[in-house]
Amino acid sequence: MAATCEISNIFSNYFSAMYSSEDSTLASVPPAATFGADDLVLTLSNPQMSLEGTEKASWLGEQPQFWSKTQVLDWISYQVEKNKYDASAIDFSRCDMDGATLCNCALEELRLVFGPLGDQLHAQLRDLTSSSSDELSWIIELLEKDGMAFQEALDPGPFDQGSPFAQELLDDGQQASPYHPGSCGAGAPSPGSSDVSTAGTGASRSSHSSDSGGSDVDLDPTDGKLFPSDGFRDCKKGDPKHGKRKRGRPRKLSKEYWDCLEGKKSKHAPRGTHLWEFIRDILIHPELNEGLMKWENRHEGVFKFLRSEAVAQLWGQKKKNSNMTYEKLSRAMRYYYKREILERVDGRRLVYKFGKNSSGWKEEEVLQSRN
């Protein structure tokens, strides 16, 4: 009697929202306390009762194999009402099972317990398990895509798809500088040439105002020579306008100037160079610097960009990227913070420092390489 009352109570929890198109007549059942066990069959056979008080079915939103015994009974009651089936033909003593047991029942077993309704139950179970599996796969795929998109958002800069630095940073080969005499041969490994996968995703630290940069930099006329006249015709010594460049696209440097900066490469030299080596080689060759950068403290490895956009343009020419800007270049430089090749000098705009894992910039190293 108690088991029958429990089943009667379960049958009161119908829900038709998921099947509203075909279950508009699905009725709720009054609480078990309002009728006795003898009223169970009558209740199941009377679908014309009020829809008021309909509750969400407990089995919705879960995969059938994870249903509890209560959820299984709830689902069976729903199918009875949906198919207008005579509940008196069901052997309820054999309905005491959880979802895993129900899913393992063969078609013949369901027919034995539920009669003709067994075919419908078997088909519905198959559809539910199939749709659950498809939905789970879809959710996993969506999460994987979202995870990758989120990671890209957290890790801007050189790893952005289409980034001008991606190929340079992901090069497997060890790339030596074509400017540095000590690295033009078969080439000792460069500190910046190891596989980028070892650097992790911590390369992209939050941008500092000193990194966001800009092309407008006050240039002290005593800070060195300016660009050659063929590269920047209006920047002549003594010109009162040369101290501060106007806003706008940087002037295009001549092919002769770029050829001079790049120098003659050995046919065995690796293609390209790393960004930090490119910066280093500008600094250690004053004859090629032409006012692009200067040492702030040579002993400590501290340097400053004087013509930030011009340096970015040179790097863009080397990488065949006409859209290069200092903002993009400074983002790529942050990749080297994690590897301690470059460091940011806090509180100083356009000022950076070579880290402990950099090489080839110290005076003794330069002198040794030239001997």
Swiss-Prot record:
The keyword Phosphoprotein does not apply. Residues 231-241 have a biased composition (Basic and acidic residues). SUPFAM superfamilies: SAM/Pointed domain (SSF47769), Winged helix' DNA-binding domain (SSF46785). Induction: Transcriptionally regulated by ERBB2 receptor signaling in breast cancer epithelial cells. Up-regulated by phorbol 12-myristate 13-acetate (PMA) in bronchial epithelial cells. By retinoic acid in MCF-7 mammary epithelial cells (at protein level). A motif (9aaTAD) lies at residues 137-145. InterPro entries: Elf-3_PNT, Ets_dom, ETS_fam, Pointed_dom, SAM/pointed_sf, WH-like_DNA-bd_sf, WH_DNA-bd_sf. It is found in: Cytoplasm; Nucleus. Residues 46-132 form the PNT domain. Changing residue 315 to A: Partially abrogates repressive effect on the KRT4 promoter. The 9aaTAD motif is a transactivation domain present in a large number of yeast and animal transcription factors. The lineage of its organism: Eukaryota, Metazoa, Chordata, Craniata, Vertebrata. Residues 273-355 bind DNA. This is ETS-related transcription factor Elf-3. It holds the Pfam family Ets. Residues 181-216 have a biased composition (Low complexity). It comes from the Eukaryota. One of its GO terms (biological process) is extracellular matrix organization. Expressed exclusively in tissues containing a high content of terminally differentiated epithelial cells including mammary gland, colon, trachea, kidney, prostate, uterus, stomach and skin. Belongs to the ETS family. Interacts with TBP. Interacts with CREBBP and EP300; these act as transcriptional coactivators of ELF3 and positively modulate its function. Interacts with XRCC5/KU86 and XRCC6/KU70; these inhibit the ability of ELF3 to bind DNA and negatively modulate its transcriptional activity. Associated with CLND7 and POU2F3. Interacts with ZNF768. Changing residue 319 to A: Partially abrogates repressive effect on the KRT4 promoter. Transcriptional activator that binds and transactivates ETS sequences containing the consensus nucleotide core sequence GGA[AT]. Acts synergistically with POU2F3 to transactivate the SPRR2A promoter and with RUNX1 to transactivate the ANGPT1 promoter. Also transactivates collagenase, CCL20, CLND7, FLG, KRT8, NOS2, PTGS2, SPRR2B, TGFBR2 and TGM3 promoters. Represses KRT4 promoter activity. Involved in mediating vascular inflammation. May play an important role in epithelial cell differentiation and tumorigenesis. May be a critical downstream effector of the ERBB2 signaling pathway.
